[in-house]
């Protein structure tokens, strides 16, 4: 009897969250959440300026932690969350920020764990790519260095089947090739070739990596 009551409670909670998501999408025309995405996205915080677009694909999931997942999109920005992406928040807050006119793309089957993505131009993550707990990806300096040296920005491209381990920072203009691994607490300031293990501060190539297409 108690189990049946619990199941009914969960069904009612999901229906409530679905209704909240439908209301949010009506109030924010740029917000598009696929009906097959998790109803837990109702617990996320969405801030979209006029002209911004956020799309969350089918099968995408997150935890039901109020405010632990935040999307901040300035005017004209676009964010695409692919099919079956897991935006995990039970280990820490996850923040995705796209500034004016910038874009962020998270490929299908990706996994982000309490991470930060920040784009002033473009940040792209390929299919089946993992970003570990506390890691950060920035495509800009974030601030001017001084009066003579203004902030610079350059797109970040992260390939398919890449694993960026915990507490790692990826800086502007970096390209990380397919099937590569970046070790924990690394600072990535230059390109990492495909099938490469890199770590350190700054991260440098240390070994080769095989096929990661079937990893979990």
Residue ranges and their predicted role:
Residues 146-151:
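Regulatory activation segment
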Residues 174, 186, 192:
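Short beta-to-alpha loop/turn elements within the nucleotide-binding domains of ABC transporters
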Residues 166, 184, 201:
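Gly/Ser/Thr-rich helix-start
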């Amino acid at each position: 009897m108690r189990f049946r009551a619990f199941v009914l409670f969960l069904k009612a909670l999901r229906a409530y969250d679905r209704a909240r998501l439908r209301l949010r999408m009506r109030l924010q025309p740029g917000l598009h959440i696929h009906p097959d995405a998790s109803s837990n996205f109702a617990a996320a915080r969405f801030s979209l300026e006029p002209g911004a677009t956020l799309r969350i694909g089918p099968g995408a999931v997150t935890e039901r932690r109020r405010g632990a997942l935040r999307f901040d999109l300035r005017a004209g920005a676009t964010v695409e969350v692919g099919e079956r992406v897991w935006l995990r928040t039970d280990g820490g807050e996850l923040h995705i920020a796209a500034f004016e006119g910038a874009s962020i793309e998270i490929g299908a089957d990706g996994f982000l764990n309490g991470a930060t993505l920040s784009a002033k131009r473009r940040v792209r993550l390929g299919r089946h790519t993992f970003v570990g707990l506390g890691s950060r990806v920035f495509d800009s300096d974030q601030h001017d260095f001084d009066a003579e040296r203004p902030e610079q920005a350059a797109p970040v491209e992260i390939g398919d089947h890449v694993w960026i381990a915990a507490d790692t920072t990826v800086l502007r203009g970096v390209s990380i090739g397919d099937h590569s691994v970046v070790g924990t607490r690394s600072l990535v300031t230059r390109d990492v070739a495909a099938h490469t293990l890199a770590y350190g501060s700054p991260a440098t190539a240390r070994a080769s990596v095989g096929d990661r297409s079937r990893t979990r």
